[in-house]
Amino acid sequence: MAQAEGAYHRPLATSRLELNLVRLLCRCESMAAEKREPDEWRLEKYVGALEDMLQALKVQASKPASEVISEYSRKVDFLKGMLQAEKLTSSSEKALANQFLAPGRVPTTAKERVPATKTVHLQSRARYTSEMRSELLGMEPSGECEVDMRKRAAKGSRPADERQSASELDLVLQRHQGLQEKLAEEMLGLARSLKTNTLAAQSVIKKDNQTLSHSLKMADQNLEKLKLESERLEQHAQKSVNWLLWAMLIVVCFVFISMILFIRIMPRLK
């Protein structure tokens, strides 16, 4: 019965280390889904123990399939990232860190229809969104100020209280409207800055393309000129060689004729 409650959802038999890891993982998921005190330290210790058990499971001889180990790692990393997000100061930072968390894809136990880490992820997102909304409206996170104003308006016993509630509500609405206008101006400024940077980048890219095209054109022209000069030098070299050959032939013929004449003239002189 204990194995059915804690065992991971797969047909093969699991080792004792994996059973302990799954049981501790289920415990951590249930603790993460509950409302905890700020000084609660057990969940962080449990997650640290999960990391150690996961590392031991990876090097075990009878370790599970790689998909199962990947799912375990995904859930442990999610719990670790959730604890790190809770330590941040502002709700906007918490919400941003929560967006980058990746919950598990497969339920840890057979009783779960939806992975517990996914439920915890949705709860954290809703809580951080509520805190951000409360900070923007200048209200307490629990919404006690809004409930108190509604109660005062509903009683109707004192006109002064009604006027005070109405003025407080108007103040909240004005503040909210001012924040919205400020955000709209900032977004408009960012859009203008982005447009300016985009136009500047396009201009720089266009100039670079023109420079590159001009350089390629000049390179082609220089290559054509180099080919023409090479052909001209080759023709000139061939002409020089031809003239040299003719000169050598003439010299050889002259020497040959001179030798013949010399041989014929010398006997007559004797």
Swiss-Prot record:
Residues 206-242 form a coiled coil. Residues 264-270 are lumenal. It comes from Mus musculus. This is Vesicle transport protein USE1. InterPro entries: Vesicle_transport_protein_Use1. Keywords: Coiled coil, Endoplasmic reticulum, ER-Golgi transport, Membrane, Protein transport, Transmembrane, Transmembrane helix, Transport. Residues 1-242 are cytoplasmic. The chain crosses the membrane at residues 243-263. It is found in: Endoplasmic reticulum membrane. Component of a SNARE complex consisting of STX18, USE1L, BNIP1/SEC20L and SEC22B. Interacts directly with STX18. Belongs to the USE1 family. GO terms for biological process: endoplasmic reticulum organization; endoplasmic reticulum tubular network organization; protein transport; regulation of ER to Golgi vesicle-mediated transport; vesicle-mediated transport. CDD domains: SNARE_USE1. SNARE that may be involved in targeting and fusion of Golgi-derived retrograde transport vesicles with the ER. Its main location: endoplasmic reticulum. Disulfide bonds: none annotated. It holds the Pfam family Use1. One of its GO terms (cellular component) is COPI-coated vesicle. The lineage of its organism: Eukaryota, Metazoa, Chordata, Craniata, Vertebrata. It is a single-pass type IV membrane protein.
